[in-house]
C-alpha cells in the first residue's frame, strides 16, 4: 500500500489516503453515456506481472458480446507492441490508447470510466483514487501490500493460489483464469 500511495502522490503531486479520494478539476470528459467505458491496464512493471495481451483481447471481445462498450488502453510508449496488437484486433476499433498522453492528461477520462480491469499498476491505484471500481489482476505481486486497501478494488489471483497469498515470486501470469476475470468484470459492470 505504501508503494502505491507514494507512486500516486508522485504522479499527481497530492497526498492520498489508503482509501484514496483523488479530487480533480471538473472537466467535461464527453464520454457517451450509452456505452460502458472500460480502462484496460495492460502495462506492468515487468513481464512476470503482466497478464497476456491475448487475454485482454479475448476479455474485450467477450464483454463486447454482452455490453455496448468502449475500451481505453492504459499503457505507455514502452507498451507500444502490446497496444498495437490490441488496436489491430477485432475489438481495436472500439478503443482509445493512452500511449501518447501523460498520466495527468488521462485523469478526466479515467474519472468517467465505469471500470478498470488490468494488472496491478499505477493505473489501478489511480482509478481507485478517482472512485472507479478496479478489477485488478495480481500475477506476481502481493495483494496484502497492494490490493487490500480499498473497497473499490476487487482482485483476481492465479488459480491454485490461496486468496490474498500472491507474492513477488508467485509467477502466476499464465494461471489467471480468463473466465474468472470475465465473470468479475461483468458483475462489476452491472
What are the roles of these predicted feature ranges?
Residues 1-190:
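Catalytic machinery of carbohydrate-active enzymes
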